[in-house]
Amino acid sequence: MIKLRLRRMGKKRQPHYRIVAAEARWPRDGRFIEVIGYYNPRTDPYTLEVNVERARWWLEHGAQPTDTVRALLVRAGVLPPRQQNEAKRETAETAQPEA
């Protein structure tokens, strides 16, 4: 399975990340198929650059983003934000624990 995930770069205690498409079984900092963008959380404000066209192509072809990459793709405008299921929320509120 292909994953969109972060690949750590940089010096010790100074990380920045590349957003890559890689096989899920490959090591985090090992082989990858393609670099899609980069993310630097150490700058103020953070730096995020994503090739939107390639990210959408990978998502259309079945690549699964990790939770962190999903959040970054939402910030970049590639993915819509997750919507909470209204029905699930209502049942949780109406269900009262029996005492």
Swiss-Prot record:
InterPro entries: Ribosomal_bS16, Ribosomal_bS16_dom_sf. GO terms for molecular function: structural constituent of ribosome. The keyword Ribosomal protein applies. The keyword Ribosomal protein applies. One of its GO terms (biological process) is translation. It comes from the Bacteria. PANTHER family: 30S RIBOSOMAL PROTEIN S16, SMALL RIBOSOMAL SUBUNIT PROTEIN BS16M. This is Small ribosomal subunit protein bS16. GO terms for cellular component: cytoplasm; small ribosomal subunit. The gene is rpsP. Belongs to the bacterial ribosomal protein bS16 family. Keywords: Ribonucleoprotein, Ribosomal protein. It comes from Thermomicrobium roseum (strain ATCC 27502 / DSM 5159 / P-2). Residues 80-99 are annotated as: Disordered.
